[in-house]
Structure formats: C-alpha cells, structure tokens
Amino acid sequence: MAEQKKKGLSRLNKAILFLITSAFFFALMNMFVRLSGDVPTIQKTFFRNFFALFIASGAMIKNRCSIILPKGARFDLFMRAACGYAGVVLNFYAIDRLSISDASLLNKMSPFFAIIFSTFLLKERANKVQWAIILTAFIGALFVIKPSFQNAELGASIAGCCGGMCAGAAYTFVRRATGKGVKSYYVVFFFSAFSTLVAFPLMLLDFKPMTLVQTLMLVGSGVSAAIAQFCITTAYSYAPAKEVSIYDYSQIIFAALIGFVVLNQVPDVLSFVGYAVIIAAAFVMFRYNNRKTKE
C-alpha cells in the first residue's frame, strides 16, 4: 500500500513539473507572437503549428509510432485538435487587438474551464477546498494582469474568453485520449497536423510577405509551442485537471520575468501582490493534494 501511495505522489509531482515547464514555453511563444508584428492572425497560427509539426514528427519517428488514428480515441483526438486550434486562433486574435494583459487574463481562464469540462466529460469532481484554491489563484491573476476592459474592443474580449474556454476543453480531451492509451507525442502530432492543414488554405486568402525577423519570431513561436504542447499533454496524462491546473497560472510569472528581461518592464506593487497570492495558492494546492494522496 505504501508503495502505491508513493507511486501516486510521484505521478502528481511529475504532472506539476511538466505543467510549469509548459507554462514557461507558452510564455515564450506569446512573446514571439507579439514580436512578429503585423502578420495576419491566421498566418501566425500556420507558422506556429507548421514548425511545431516538424518537431512532433521527429518524436513520432523516434518512437516508431504509426500515424493511423487509434481506434476508440478518434473522437477525442479530433475534438482536442478542433478545440485547440480554435483556442489558438482566438487567443492570437485577442493578442493582436487587446492589451497583452487583457488577452493573457482571458486565456488564463482555460484551467478553470478545464475543471468544468472535466466534471462532465471525465466525472472528476473538484471539492470545495480545491474550488476555493482555484478561485484564489484567479484573484491573484487579476492583481497581476489588472485588465482594462474599458478600452478593449468587445468582440476581441469575447474572442479571448472563448479562446480560454476552447483551450480548457482541449486539455480535457487530452485526458480522455491519453486515458485510452494514446501517447502524448501522438496527441501533439495530430494537433499540429490538423492545425497546419486547416490554416494553410485560410492563410492563402490573406497572405502577407514577412521580413527575416518576423519569420524567425514565428519559428521561435512554433518551437516553443511544440515543447509546451508536449509538456502540457504529458502533465494531464499524469493527473486530473482539478489537481494540477492551478500551476498553469505560473505562466503569468514567467511572462512578467520575460517582459522585464526582454522589454525592460518592471512589475508594480499590485503585480507582486498577485505573485504572492498565486504562489501561495499553488503551495496550498500542492500540500492539500499530497495529503489526499497519502490518506
């Protein structure tokens, strides 16, 4: 029994590590997307997923994995890819039209939506303590992001919120697919291939020539996205959303650090308050879930 408990705790810690790593690379991806400038949104999503597809294909070849869709998980893979791509498009659309803080906040609703979708699709019900911790982290995110909806376009704000919802749904279908034995690298490969094929014809309708710098930025976004996708897919295969999704908020901290180093941005007092709230919530969730695992 003690050995089983230890194994369960190890899986939880692995999920946390992979999710935090994913958050870091998603923060890098957003930085590259922003630095790519006035490239059309669909064009950005194409190059982001096109380069990610190369990395995902390499993982498929290394593991000698067939590209044939696994039986029993086809619906989950299609839904993960469709929801995931919709989330990427809506998120990029929001980033291009809202302040980065507004767009980031709306996208960070995805873990909250993941728990809601997990309740219906996976029958994983969070208890009152876990709900309270997640809401506390969300409040901390508000301190950090300080959204100014007064100056935001209503359509872009709705798009950003829907993007977070789509991302939350996608992560839930990741859990369903990997729970049926689908490997994490196959999930990433299928998503990248699906997104590239969907984006290509749409991109041709409004293609804009890019500079070398813009091209390099989008290559960076694709590589960062691929690494982040591998990590987040693996994270949700180790543990349910209700136990680890809180750590996705660490992306806010990484974004602030990257902003300081790359853009010379210094967080204000409210941001530091938010950091403290988020880190405290993450620590409480970690201790609470570990205690539950031992019981």
Residue map of PLM features:
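Hydrophobic/small/kink-forming positions within alpha-helical transmembrane segments
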Residues: A23-A27, S57, A81, Y85-V89, ...
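Juxtamembrane C-cap of transmembrane helices in multi-pass membrane transport proteins
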Residues: F25-V39, K44, V89-I100, L106, ...
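Helix-helix packing/entry segments at the starts of transmembrane helices
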Residues: S104-M109, K180-A193, Q229-F260
